[in-house]
Amino acid sequence: MEWRDEGVILGTRRHGETSAIVEVMTCGHGRHMGMVRGGRSRRMQPLLQPGNHVDVSWWARLDEHMGTFTIEPLSFAAARLIETPVALYGIQLAAAHLRLLPERDPHRGLYETLRLIIEHFDDPLAAGELLLRFEVMMLEELGFGLDLKECAATGRKDDLIYVSPKSGRAVCREAGAPWAEKLLSLPSFVNDTALRASCYDDLDRAFTMTGYFLMRHVWEPRAQTPPDSRSGFLNAVGRAINLSQAS
């Protein structure tokens, strides 16, 4: 059994004296584990850092075996990612989300969004938007997709500013007004890719919304808590935006 693909390194752990078990999010084969012989060598360690874009070949005698990776660099991002808290927490958060998915299930859309996130860590607001969309996609891939395109009460497709915490469906301003305190906020950029978040508050409200549904449908049923990297990422984004506005 063998294949070749491109991927992004998510994590590495030692295996024996010289090898490493490497976790890669691949384009066509999902999140995949494999052993890299000599993975702890000085030559290989810089390559096997989270965030690096790699060419990966996998081989195993049987499909159910972990198998062996041969990994070659396509582009190095890890050194840049450890320079800022936004990037460091961001790649950790993306990896934590991907670990909610079954291993080896292909999710090309998530892979492509992961690549975009890594490319935009130098713009905290853009990185926040992309990771927010990543969480919306995660809910969809896990079977708990949100319906944000039209009002659950009226069918209107404009002025959608709320989300029902019960149904995960959008609600327009007029229909939601009597129950506004019980509804989740829906910033306009979330369901319109032509729009951008205008400030940190937009991101904070959007992440509160996705966090509610991740907790309800994913973390609590699995007896898990939100990863620390999530709050770390949001705090880092907030600080970075405040600093840029002050300068």
Swiss-Prot record:
One of its GO terms (cellular component) is bacterial nucleoid. The keyword Plastid does not apply. InterPro entries: ARFGAP/RecO, DNA_rep/recomb_RecO_N, NA-bd_OB-fold, RecO, RecO_C. It comes from the Bacteria. Keywords: DNA damage, DNA recombination, DNA repair. GO terms for biological process: DNA recombination; double-strand break repair. Involved in DNA repair and RecF pathway recombination. HAMAP family: RecO. Belongs to the RecO family. This is DNA repair protein RecO. It comes from Brucella abortus (strain 2308). The lineage of its organism: Bacteria, Pseudomonadati, Pseudomonadota, Alphaproteobacteria, Hyphomicrobiales. The gene is recO.
